[in-house]
């Protein structure tokens, strides 16, 4: 895994610079309001992250990482990556609206319960998204297949899922403390999660992974 990061360091860094540009666009959009920021996240950042994961998926199969693969994959998987991330973005927006309603109406337990349920569903969807884009990049599955496989992996590999979640949180915390760490966080995360997802997918869906177990 470390060799994947080292061998592909140039292309990972180059694609990370694109993600930086989109990240600044997200920040500027958030100054306007949450809806524009979420639109940037869904229609720009998610496809770009998928493109990086497609590069890394080539490496997981023993091929070289190439920027061309990311560009072609980003176009090919664009609408599927949007379809996978849009529900989570809409739910996040709903949670923020509900949180505002609860803060303005204290003492209404039914509103608090509804918000708690929304947060629970949102956290569950966020955990499933650990696998969603990597599965899409690795297996070229439909949106429905990708979602079902994400549920299957999260349910079958509970401890590995928790470990990936902790790694994600740790990388985000580190990047928050040191801004320049953002230069390596996207690449490191993609290498870790794509390789982990590839190993799991080969066990639960060998046919989709191109493995003949007959």
Model-found features: residue ranges?
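Helix-coil boundary and N-terminal low-complexity module in membrane systems
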Residues: 1-104, 110-113, 128-214
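Generic alpha-helical transmembrane segments
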Residues: 121-128
């Amino acid at each position: 895994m470390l060799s994947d990061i080292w061998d592909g360091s140039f292309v990972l860094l180059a694609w990370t610079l694109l993600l930086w540009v989109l990240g600044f666009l997200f920040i500027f959009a958030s100054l306007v309001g949450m809806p524009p920021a979420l639109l940037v996240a869904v229609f720009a950042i998610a496809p770009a992250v998928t493109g990086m994961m497609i590069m890394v998926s080539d490496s997981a199969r023993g091929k070289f990482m190439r920027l061309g693969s990311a560009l072609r994959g980003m176009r090919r998987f664009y609408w599927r990556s949007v379809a996978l991330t849009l529900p989570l973005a809409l739910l996040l927006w709903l949670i923020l609206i509900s949180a505002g309603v609860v803060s303005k109406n204290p003492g209404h337990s039914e509103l608090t319960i509804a918000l708690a349920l929304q947060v629970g569903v949102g956290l569950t969807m966020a955990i499933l998204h650990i696998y969603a884009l990597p599965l899409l990049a690795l297996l070229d599955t439909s949106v429905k297949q990708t979602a079902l496989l994400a549920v299957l992996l999260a349910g079958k590999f509970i401890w590995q899922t928790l470990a990936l979640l902790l790694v994600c949180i740790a990388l985000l915390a580190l990047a928050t403390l040191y801004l320049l760490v953002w230069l390596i966080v996207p690449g490191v995360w993609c290498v870790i999660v794509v390789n982990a997802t590839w190993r799991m997918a080969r066990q639960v869906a060998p046919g989709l992974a191109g493995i003949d177990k007959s």
